[in-house]
């Protein structure tokens, strides 16, 4: 079929949420003429649920996005109202930053960034179809009949795909926050041959700040110590007048109200069909599943400086409006609270992610990429990370350059994508530190060391950032080398000082680096014995030095595991392999291999239901028969 196109682009991104924004900024910054199409310009980078960025594992993803040259970290650093480092009492592998956002300012600032970006056209329009010829994308069709040509298309439609809002007995077609749903595109993705799933998520009610009795709640302030998501942000710009959050709890009266109205709850009446998020359940789900708990935490989170709206984190619900009011008024501090918005559930279509490659390109259609909640994930950060990778690979494909695949040992983004394309997901996927087997090397403090060079190579890290990174890396490397070269000897003068500090004396000579491996010896103590570095070191470099030195043994073990897995990842599986021709392989493994069609032995070994014996048989088969090459 011959199409008459009215406009032509290298890449078209459908949807301007957190995934779409990162995808379109990446493609345009890499030199591709890009169209970012959205149903509503006023919803660009909007936060339809929680007014926050970061958190456990998620905060590390934002740092990774920033290190690669993405925008989320820079934008939240300009628009936060509170910043807090989580898990400070635990090891460095699980520490993560979380910011309360001024949600309207966050969206407005991101819109300004997109509007000013060269090579990027922003358009309010609804895309109804993906145009495909001979198994590859050629463009899109709008609801008004316009055809735009494209060499690659990135679908980042969030919860808009056949979205339906559910509130008590009320159910109607809608995207998030009462935006338009994308129904025709959902139908046409299915017609293209993609396997579609149905998920559900929800949001809590918002209450009016001036109607809250804060005296009955517990204050939750931000941190005084400066922290940032972007490696380019300065401590001098750290916000002093942060806005606190507040903690309260449900109680037995709250639980009674919910239990008495479960027959009206869409989650239990059969109205909701989609699968909901395990790690962000509705309050009615929590009351039923954890009936023995006397109370559940609720955090009152301001949605910005210039609004009275307060987000009641932990109270996600789709109960009828009258029940929500009674529920709110049963909670300490909210007895007279005015509900400004009701909570609701939203059901939406997803593209089942086992149909994707690790580049986030669909296996079925060349040049078609998907990212974000479209792939079955939950969370702004997960969406942004996928959007960035999908955008990068769309641009690389258009330019005929090698693809970018982040491994599980490279980034949490790599862990997430590998989980999605290798294991799929039966529920909205959320990143957790427990999902990362190499989490000690995927830390908050070293994201730039892991990923900035990759961002530079693909063209997303500019000269200013690259220069700052080189200075930091050189200072780190030089000081690490210096600490490893200076010896402390167990002489009386040294041991007297060590004992005066309350520490065990030295019995053998050791380097300053070895001295720092002692749990009680921090960098400041070590340099008091060996003298300071040639130049003043930033606090973040000192933190990185302490972590790398104190956990060196564990880090080395992790890197050894990475090296072993790398050998598995380098063993490719032909695209045209006949799984039925492999004798002795278990039936479950054969079925999973057919469904996932893994690209490497490493990926095959991570598929659930596949055991080591299956992998051994597969490797023997490939050594004798695997001559073909995978092509896309």
Swiss-Prot record:
Q: What positions does the entry give for NAD(+) binding? A: 276-290
Localization (cell): Cytoplasm
Q: Which InterPro entries match?
A: FAD/NAD-bd_sf, GIDA_C_N, MnmG, MnmG-rel, MnmG-rel_CS, MnmG_C, MnmG_C_subdom, MnmG_C_subdom_sf
State the organism named in the record. Streptococcus pyogenes serotype M2 (strain MGAS10270)
Pfam families, A to Z = GIDA, GIDA_C_1st, SAM_GIDA_C
Its job: NAD-binding protein involved in the addition of a carboxymethylaminomethyl (cmnm) group at the wobble position (U34) of certain tRNAs, forming tRNA-cmnm(5)s(2)U34.
Please identify the protein, giving its name as recorded.
tRNA uridine 5-carboxymethylaminomethyl modification enzyme MnmG
User: What keywords tag this UniProt record?
Assistant: Cytoplasm, FAD, Flavoprotein, NAD, tRNA processing
The UniProt entry, under Gene3D superfamilies, shows:
FAD/NAD(P)-binding domain, GidA associated domain, C-terminal subdomain, tRNA uridine 5-carboxymethylaminomethyl modification enzyme MnmG/GidA
Cofactor(s) needed, names only, are: FAD
GO cellular component terms, A-Z: cytosol
Entry similarity comment: Belongs to the MnmG family.
Gene Ontology molecular functions: flavin adenine dinucleotide binding
Key word Flavoprotein present: yes
What quaternary arrangement does the UniProt entry report? Homodimer. Heterotetramer of two MnmE and two MnmG subunits.
Chain sites annotated for binding FAD: 15-20, 127, 182, 373
UniProt record, GO biological process: tRNA methylation; tRNA wobble uridine modification
